[in-house]
Amino acid sequence: MKLAVIAKPYANAIFELAQQDNSHLQWKMVLDVGAYLLLDKKMRRLIASPNILEQDKLSTIKALLMSILNRELDAHEAMFISVLLDNNRIGILPSIATLFESLINITNNIKIFTIISSYQLSKSEKEQIVSDLMNQYNKTVSIDIVVDKDLVGGVIIKDGDKVIDISIKARVDELGLRLSKTH
């Protein structure tokens, strides 16, 4: 089963809770820090170890979260981490964080695109792309820029699974495909 399918009910539940008390930013921080902690090999080994008591795992995760966040976890946050551990779902925390952020963006009418370019775009080029995308989608737009030296020119615009490839490489590949079909 895909992680997103398992993570979605958790993300939705947290989002509903955050809607009630306007704690989106607080939850986003907890989820992002928790997801970050799971990048660490030692943390993943600790969680997977059958020799460490669940209570000790929970205490360690909570202590690390509080240390990084520089505050105590509230009752809902502590319970959430406990539920994930009890149900062997702590590993889906990165997926929950991603889905939660998507829910925030949908609610705030924000669309995030990944722009892949062969070079670092100038400020005016970024502004032009954002303006064009805002006009096309009628939403607030945020872009992440990725430089790919293998592109000859142009850009690739990614919106989730959708890809708009207006790179020279794509045009050359398309031309090559057409030529190969005619011979």
From Swiss-Prot:
It is a peripheral membrane protein. Gene3D superfamilies: N-terminal domain of the delta subunit of the F1F0-ATP synthase. It is found in: Cell inner membrane. Keywords: ATP synthesis, Cell inner membrane, Cell membrane, CF(1), Hydrogen ion transport, Ion transport, Membrane, Transport. The keyword Ion transport applies. The keyword DNA damage does not apply. InterPro entries: ATP_synth_OSCP/delta_N_sf (IPR026015), ATPase_OSCP/d_CS (IPR020781), ATPase_OSCP/dsu (IPR000711). Its main location: membrane. One of its GO terms (molecular function) is proton-transporting ATP synthase activity, rotational mechanism. GO terms for cellular component: plasma membrane; proton-transporting ATP synthase complex. Belongs to the ATPase delta chain family. F-type ATPases have 2 components, F(1) - the catalytic core - and F(0) - the membrane proton channel. F(1) has five subunits: alpha(3), beta(3), gamma(1), delta(1), epsilon(1). F(0) has three main subunits: a(1), b(2) and c(10-14). The alpha and beta chains form an alternating ring which encloses part of the gamma chain. F(1) is attached to F(0) by a central stalk formed by the gamma and epsilon chains, while a peripheral stalk is formed by the delta and b chains. F(1)F(0) ATP synthase produces ATP from ADP in the presence of a proton or sodium gradient. F-type ATPases consist of two structural domains, F(1) containing the extramembraneous catalytic core and F(0) containing the membrane proton channel, linked together by a central stalk and a peripheral stalk. During catalysis, ATP synthesis in the catalytic domain of F(1) is coupled via a rotary mechanism of the central stalk subunits to proton translocation. This is ATP synthase subunit delta. It comes from Vesicomyosocius okutanii subsp. Calyptogena okutanii (strain HA). The gene is atpH.
